[in-house]
Regions:
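Outer-envelope exported proteins of Gram-negative bacteria
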Residues: 3, 112-116, 200
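Active-site environment of divalent metal-dependent phosphoester hydrolases
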Residues: 6-12
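Active-site neighborhood of phospho(di)ester-bond hydrolases with catalytic His/Asp-centered motifs
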Residues: 1-5, 32-33
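C-terminal subdomain of the subtilisin-like protease fold in secreted/lumenal serine endopeptidases
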Residues: 28-31, 42-43, 101-169, 173
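Extracellular S/T/G-rich loop segment that most often corresponds to the catalytic His/Ser-adjacent loop
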Residues: 18-97, 101, 105
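Extracellular repeat-rich scaffold modules on cell surfaces
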Residues: 78, 85, 90-91, 98-101, ...
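Residue-level detector of functionally special positions within alpha-helical transmembrane segments
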Residues: 5, 84-86, 132, 137
C-alpha cells in the first residue's frame, strides 16, 4: 500500500506506479490518492465541493483508490489539521487488516480486489485517471468483494482457497463482473448477494 504523493500531478509517484513497469507486482499493490480541503478556512470539511485530489492516478489507475487525506491532532489544546496521502494510506491499511480479520483466508491479492471492487465511483464514470476505482468504502469492503473482474483478477478467474478450518464464510455484496470464480479448500463460502458475474464457477477440493 503506497501513497500517491502530494504534488497534484496527473500521475502518482514513481513507487506507486511500479506495477506499470513491473506488471507482476500488481497483484500485491494498492496506490492511495488523497482528498484534501480546497479552502484553508474549511480544513477538515469533507463536503464534496471543498475537496481536491492531492495527486492523479494516471498510469496507476487500475490499482488506485482514494480516501480523505486530512488528519486532526491536538497540540497545546488547539486542533491542528495536517494533510497528505501519507495520512490516506493508513486508512486503507487499516481496512485491509479488518477485512483479513473477518476473512483470514484472503491473500494480499484478494484483499486488493476486495478493497478496489467496493470503492464508491467518483469523478468520471468507471476507473478514471484521477481517483482510480473511486472512494474507499470501508463498510462495503467488510462485506467481501463486489466484482469478479478480469482487470482486478488479472486473468479470467478469481481464485479463492479457503483455510481448511471448515468455517462458514459469507460475502454479502452483490457480485457482478466479467470474470469467474475458482473455489478451493475446505470450508463453506456463501454468496448472499445477487451474483451476476459472467464467468464460470468451479468448486473443488484442490
Amino acid at each position: 500500500i503506497f501513497s500517491a504523493g502530494n504534488n497534484e500531478y496527473k500521475t502518482s509517484g514513481i513507487l506507486a506506479t511500479l506495477p506499470y513497469w513491473i506488471p507482476d507486482l500488481e497483484k500485491g499493490w494498492i496506490n492511495v490518492n488523497g482528498l484534501t480541503s480546497k479552502n484553508s478556512n474549511r480544513e477538515g470539511d469533507f463536503i464534496w465541493d471543498n475537496l481536491k485530489p492531492l495527486a492523479g492516478a494516471g498510469a496507476a489507475k487500475n490499482w488506485t483508490i482514494t480516501t480523505t487525506a486530512d488528519y486532526f491532532i491536538e497540540v497545546d489544546g488547539q486542533k491542528k489539521v495536517y494533510s497528505g496521502t501519507s495520512y490516506s494510506a493508513p486508512r486503507v491499511t487499516a481496512t485491509a487488516a479488518l477485512i483479513n480479520e473477518k476473512y483470514p483466508f484472503m491473500t494480499g491479492d484478494l484483499l486488493r480486489q476486495t478493497i478496489l471492487s467496493t470503492a464508491t465511483d467518483i469523478g468520471d464514470e468507471g476507473v478514471d485517471d484521477v481517483y482510480g476505482w473511486g472512494l474507499l468504502n470501508i463498510d462495503k469492503a467488510l462485506k467481501g468483494p463486489a466484482l469478479f473482474d478480469k482487470r482486478l483478477a488479472l486473468g479470467d478467474n478469481v481464485y479463492i482457497t479457503l483455510d481448511g478450518s471448515n468455517k462458514v464464510y459469507q460475502f454479502d455484496n452483490d457480485i457482478s463482473g466479467d470474470a469467474g470464480l475458482v473455489l478451493r479448500g475446505s470450508g463453506t463460502l456463501i454468496l448472499n448477494g445477487t451474483s451476476t458475474y459472467m464467468g464460470e464457477t468451479n468448486v473443488g477440493d484442490n
